[in-house]
């Protein structure tokens, strides 16, 4: 079908998908209008993607119509085997009721499992599938939905807005501090599928929350697209941590879109651990930081095979005393390409920003590029950048091998130590799994 598909054909397919989604989700008219307006922008917007060309995009669009409401499950035991295996390895099954505030799971185009501790709901924590939040909290959603994005930015942005499906709405009431993390997992089960969850985070004054996202797919999935969009709104003194753990198989393209508006004295820490980047992974999150606000963007990147990974981050320090840090550590193997970009714009006095990029090259054919951008529009601003790209030092290997380690074990130990500082805010059960994957990758078994 994709060989003869045109943009006009794509328009008809997307129109059918919009109607199916509106019917399936019992969607209010104002949301359906947003979808149709995005479709108009899709037809004329630039693609702006170095890997996904128009033919590839049309392959995703050519997927048959969205089916009915995904069947919900009441127990973790009823989840798809791939997701259940992942949760078992992480110990989620055992700790769900005790140590985490809740868990949601989305397969393909809908949330099928959503369990959150009732005591937190009574205190003012709202966690719902996005389509349900649109119906139950229309005023809040109208105020925040797509206020940080414009459909005309690119075809992929417009496509997401037109066909978004699933995701969650996370609302934290004023003064509520959730001490345990919320977990959200995405699983792609079908090939040639575009999964487009929409996530909205609203943290009211003096609130705190930590959301952990996990992304994966069975190894046999071919040529699928994960196209998620996250909007975060942090009010005064709010603290939000967003941790994203990606482990996609090699034929999945990933295009996460994250933006956050960080209010006065608020703090947003966004950490991405990309262990399985899929065929390509391109992201350029944006943040707007208010007076004395703070944003920290951390990235741990594992490049393998012929993967193409291009991760950036743009920070606008708009309020006096605003601060931003963009830090990444990359381990690059085989013939993979990793590109890191960072841009910090100082727009107010007494702002500070720093970009750091460290990379370990484990192959002569691996490639690393870094593009820092520091822009000061005021006199009283401090902006800085540092980068270090190189191979493992022979003396480090020699020392560890002299202590009885094989070269493989020594390399694994060095690589794990290299990324360790970036994992400080991640629960230990995830850190253990991350280190296992790194060990397998370095030894050629991943």
UniProtKB/Swiss-Prot annotation:
Pfam families: SUFBD_core. InterPro entries: Fe-S_cluster_assembly_SufBD, SUF_FeS_clus_asmbl_SufB, SUF_FeS_clus_asmbl_SufBD_core, SUF_FeS_clus_asmbl_SufBD_sf. GO terms for biological process: iron-sulfur cluster assembly. Belongs to the iron-sulfur cluster assembly SufBD family. This is Iron-sulfur cluster assembly SufBD family protein PH1385.
């Amino acid at each position: 079908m994709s060989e003869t598909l045109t943009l006009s054909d794509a328009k008809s397919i997307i129109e059918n998908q919009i109607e199916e989604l509106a019917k399936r989700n019992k969607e209010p008219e104002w949301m359906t209008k947003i979808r149709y307006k995005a479709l108009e922008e899709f037809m004329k917007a630039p693609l702006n993607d170095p890997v996904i060309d128009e033919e590839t995009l049309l392959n995703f669009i050519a997927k048959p119509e969205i089916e009915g409401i995904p069947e919900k499950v009441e127990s973790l035991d009823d989840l798809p085997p791939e997701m259940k295996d992942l949760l078992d390895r992480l110990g989620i099954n055992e700790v769900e009721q005790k140590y985490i505030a809740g868990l949601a799971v989305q397969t393909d185009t809908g949330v099928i499992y959503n369990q959150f501790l009732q005591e937190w709901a009574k205190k003012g924590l709202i966690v719902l599938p996005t389509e349900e939040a649109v119906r139950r909290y229309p005023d809040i959603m109208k105020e925040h939905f797509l206020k940080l994005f414009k459909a005309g930015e690119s075809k992929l942005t417009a496509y997401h807005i037109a066909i978004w499906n699933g995701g969650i709405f996370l609302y934290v009431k004023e003064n509520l501090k959730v001490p345990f993390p919320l977990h959200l997992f995405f699983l792609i089960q079908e090939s040639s599928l575009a999964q487009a969850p929409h996530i909205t985070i609203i943290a009211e004054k003096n609130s705190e929350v930590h959301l952990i996202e996990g992304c994966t797919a069975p190894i046999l999935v071919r040529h699928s697209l994960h196209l998620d969009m996250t909007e975060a709104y942090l009010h005064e003194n709010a603290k939000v941590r967003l941790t994203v753990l990606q482990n996609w198989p090699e034929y999945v393209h990933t295009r996460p879109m994250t933006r956050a508006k960080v209010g006065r004295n608020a703090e947003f820490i966004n950490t991405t651990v990309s262990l399985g980047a899929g065929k390509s992974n391109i992201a350029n999150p944006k943040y707007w930081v208010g007076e004395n606000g703070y944003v920290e963007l951390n990235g741990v990147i594992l490049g393998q095979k012929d993967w193409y990974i291009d991760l950036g981050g743009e920070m606008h320090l708009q309020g006096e005393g605003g601060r931003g840090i963009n830090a990444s550590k990359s381990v690059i193997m085989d013939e993979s390409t990793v590109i890191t970009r960072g841009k910090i714009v100082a727009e107010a006095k007494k702002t500070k920003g720093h970009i750091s990029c460290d990379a370990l090259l484990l192959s002569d054919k691996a490639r690393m590029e870094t593009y820092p951008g520091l822009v000061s529009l005021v006199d009283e601003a401090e902006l800085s950048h540092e980068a270090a790209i190189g191979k493992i030092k022979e003396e480090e290997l020699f020392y560890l091998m002299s202590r009885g380690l094989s070269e493989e074990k020594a390399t694994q130990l060095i690589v794990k130590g290299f990324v360790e500082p970036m994992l400080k805010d991640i629960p230990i059960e995830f850190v253990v799994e991350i280190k296992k994957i790194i060990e397998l990758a370095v030894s050629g078994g991943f």
